[in-house]
């Protein structure tokens, strides 16, 4: 069964996919940041053949933004959502964005700088879900919830679901000096966080795959790139450890062709 979507990833050569002032010179005004960020998006759009103003990203709850919605909340993209000139500024509080094939050339995606982005495509029905699955979200079983949203609410069959796990911090690079405080779900992390002589190796990909396998989903493709070590990607972890060239945000997304 052939894919109906185009998946893409941006990296350092494409520019910073964020309007956060911390990624720009201190003397930049808000208008200068917006202008440069728009130019970055338009150039990325030209590269991958979509309109750089037609990018949607979920407003996902964190420990600091005080958003409150049930875990695994999804939003199905509507005509109203895509009615604005610049979709980057459309705020959709949700963990999961879902879009149907009828909305051609509308990008659904998410920023990332080490966290895996999960794309689940129902190739038969022409509907696709995306979520940002950093380790704390994997801990609360967002990968499972992302695929389950299609199965329970849109009658997707597991055999028709094809999954892409984006570039991320691989287990060889994701290491803690102690067991991570956010890893409270032992079912998720059993054998996916391993103690190697006092160093805790975290395997996000295997934790995601386990959750997908629980739903009998086996059509899974994984990006081979480690954002921490690859020169192609920004990486928060690498930046924190002193590599200033890795300061920034990548973007992983898709659109219906």
What role is predicted for each listed range?
Residues 1-257:
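Active-site microenvironment for binding and transforming phosphate-containing groups
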């Amino acid at each position: 069964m052939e894919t109906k979507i185009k998946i893409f990833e941006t990296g350092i050569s494409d520019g910073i996919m964020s309007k956060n002032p911390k990624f720009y010179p201190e003397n930049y005004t808000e208008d200068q940041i917006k202008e440069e960020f728009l130019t970055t998006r338009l150039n990325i759009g030209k590269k991958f053949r979509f309109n750089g103003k037609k990018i949607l990203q979920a407003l996902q709850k964190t420990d600091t933004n005080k958003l409150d919605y049930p875990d695994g909340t999804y939003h199905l993209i509507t005509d109203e959502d895509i009615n604005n000139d610049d979709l980057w500024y459309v705020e959709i509080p949700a963990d999961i964005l879902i879009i149907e094939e009828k909305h051609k050339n509308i990008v659904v995606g998410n920023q990332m700088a080490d966290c895996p982005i999960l794309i689940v495509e129902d190739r038969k029905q022409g509907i696709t879900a995306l979520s940002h699955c950093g380790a704390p979200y994997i801990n609360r079983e967002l990968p499972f919830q992302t695929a389950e949203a299609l199965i329970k609410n849109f009658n997707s069959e597991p055999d028709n679901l094809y999954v892409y796990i984006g570039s991320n911090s691989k287990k060889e690079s994701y290491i803690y000096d102690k067991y991570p405080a956010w890893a409270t779900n032992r079912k998720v992390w059993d054998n996916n966080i391993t103690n190697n002589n006092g160093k805790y190796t975290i395997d996000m990909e295997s934790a995601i795959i386990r959750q997908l396998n629980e739903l009998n989903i086996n059509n899974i493709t994984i990006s081979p790139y480690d954002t921490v070590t690859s020169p192609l990607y920004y990486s928060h972890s690498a930046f924190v450890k002193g590599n200033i060239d890795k300061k920034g945000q990548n973007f992983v997304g898709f659109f219906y062709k």
